[in-house]
């Protein structure tokens, strides 16, 4: 994946990440129990979660889940509906006038594909959502994706590659890309 980086397990960087995740999980749990009309407390907690003040025009409906916080930036007039998940270690940049439907997942992190490396840390790459994008309910945006200005992502879509500006994309497509080898070098599925 383009721009992919890795954090190896059992390193100072991975320990700092785990500590930050634990803090943000506590903060988002508090955020999700606040009265909906307590805007000042909500805005204060969002500032703690994201490590900086958020735009006054940002609207995030609870419940909201985030794992890192420091990787997310928001433009003006952004609306994020209920039940969204932001795994933002790799960075999530959201432009102006973006609408994000309920249950959307933006995940910038994953694990190495190779079996021998899968449990030795995490990989991450940024997500960029340009101005005036609408992401429909329950869509999933994967690491390294840019969604071009003015585009629409249909409900339930899984977006694993860049979306050109002013496009409408829908659906999911699962395509076998390659076979994985086991630690012995055998190709999975070939032993039948």
Where are the regions that the model predicts?
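Terminal amphipathic alpha-helical/low-complexity segments used for targeting or macromolecular assembly
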Residues: 1-57, 173-192
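Acidic, glycine-centered active-site loop in nucleotide-sugar glycosyltransferases
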Residues: 164-165, 170-173
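Flexible, glycine/small-residue-enriched loop-and-beta-strand segment within the central core
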Residues: 64-74, 79-146, 172-192
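Extended beta-solenoid/beta-helix repeat architectures
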Residues: 145-148, 163
